[in-house]
Design a protein with these regions (language model features):
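Short, low-complexity, polar/charged sequence segments that are solvent-exposed and flexible
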Residues: 9-11, 27-31, 45-49, 68-71, ...
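Generic secondary-structure boundary signal with a strong preference for alpha-helix termini
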Residues: 7, 43, 66-73, 80, ...
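N-terminal glycine-rich flavin-associated loop
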Residues: 1-4, 8-46, 73-92, 121
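Phosphate/pyrophosphate- and phosphate-bearing ligand-binding catalytic cores of soluble enzymes
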Residues: 84-86, 90-186
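Solvent-exposed alpha-helices and their adjacent loops that cap or buttress functional pockets
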Residues: 1-3, 18-21, 41-44, 56, ...
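Gly/Ser/Thr-rich helix-start
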Residues: 1, 8, 32, 54-62, ...
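Fold-independent oxyanion-binding glycine-rich loops
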Residues: 12-15, 24, 29-33, 53-55, ...
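A gly/ser-rich beta-alpha-beta helix-loop segment of oxidoreductase catalytic cores
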Residues: 41-79, 85, 150, 154
């Protein structure tokens, strides 16, 4: 917003980005970049997290909003999440307690802060995982202006529609106000 934000923004990034692989599980702190986690999974031949490799952002934010792309979502891989409640209590929530839906979760609704998460993946073929990640990166590049600073995907997809199609149909593709512009790519 041009008017700022009335509240506190907490960014867990440096110092909160540890990623550990144990068997088919990855435990990562909230500040770990999704690309970092995807690379760790690939190196250990773990499949199931390829969809997240090109999503900009950290694990904490991705868990809160159930981030997803190209048919995968965080709810598909989360085993448990450790959070800080509004009362200052540290709790570990199991996947079935998270009520994850399209770009929402019980964590979001409760206003909890994600501290870490355990992801459950499967053994796979390292070369196939690498190829899938490259395929998804190519698809992302063809639909998003990666060479420019971006706020990322802004609109939630209305049920039965794609935001990109609605933007194009409404004539807003390329629309610009000051230095902000709706992408030419969708």
């Amino acid at each position: 917003s041009d008017k700022g934000y009335q509240g506190v923004v907490i960014q867990l990034y440096k110092g909160f980005g540890e990623v550990k692989v144990q068997g088919c599980q990855i435990t990562a702190q909230a500040g770990a970049l999704l690309s970092q986690i995807a690379a760790a999974a690939r190196e250990e031949s773990l499949t199931g997290f390829e969809f997240a490799g090109g999503i900009p952002g950290t694990l904490g934010g991705a868990v809160v909003m159930n981030a997803g792309a190209y048919g995968g979502e965080m709810k598909d891989v989360i085993k448990e999440v450790t959070v800080l409640t509004r009362e200052g209590e540290i709790r570990t929530l199991q996947a079935e307690e998270l009520a994850m839906g399209y770009r929402t979760s019980a964590i979001k609704e409760a206003g909890y802060i994600v501290l870490s998460a355990v992801l459950s993946l499967e053994k796979g073929d390292k070369e196939q995982i690498k190829a899938r990640m490259q395929e998804l990166a190519g698809m992302r590049s063809s639909k998003q202006p990666l060479q420019y600073p971006s706020a990322g995907s802004t609109f939630k997809r209305p049920e039965g529609y794609f935001a990109g199609k609605l933007i194009m149909d409404s004539g807003l593709r390329g629309y610009q106000v000051g230095g902000a512009q709706v992408s030419e790519k969708h």
